[in-house]
């Protein structure tokens, strides 16, 4: 119940539900963590702190508990305090990308030059133009037909509750497994870009991203997002998979305000003057 209330934006009701559950069941790691997460969402960071500590002490191998406590330390202006927990998280899952995102942020906030080593934007960020699939006279014609088909897949009218989409819709399932010829043609062009990207990456056996470079790859997730007026993505990290990419199929006329540009480096933690956009790319 509390999870549904929280997903629907009923934070106060969800807090009351969890407090009632604690009174009935007693203190558990799960309930204390959930209550702490909701209090942190409301900005009551001091109240969330001991609840997260209790959860971690009760279940020290729970990565979610550790990561949320790391986030709390950063929000409270003490990024250096979180390094021990980051080390613990990496010991549990050495390649967890959310953990590395926090590590990079802590390095940046504490002035550690390892941030530039981890986030080498000039090396890791690339933009490509998709090749024209066979049977199409131009890329614009292909994109027009693909956009029309993708729009037909957006049968839901509300934004997903547990995703980064704000004022838009997202398709369900794995898009690139759709057998429609347009989707498969797009997948072929996309794979050409991925292949080019991987060929350009340097070899580095100790870097958490480059050390996972392999001979082949598979797509672990894919979807279509259709944004409405003023629609956007909230800042987020992809914790699963290894490499992320996005393709812009149809975009409105661009203004001079950088509206719709994809940003890198800025967090969702509302860090005020500590926020920083490292790079932005126009679709």
Segments the model singles out, each with a brief description of its role:
Residues 177-191, 195-283:
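Catalytic core of non-heme Fe(II) oxygenases with the double-stranded beta-helix
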Residues 26-27, 60, 93-95:
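Short coil turns that delineate tetratricopeptide repeat
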Residues 117-211, 232:
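Non-heme Fe(II)/2-oxoglutarate
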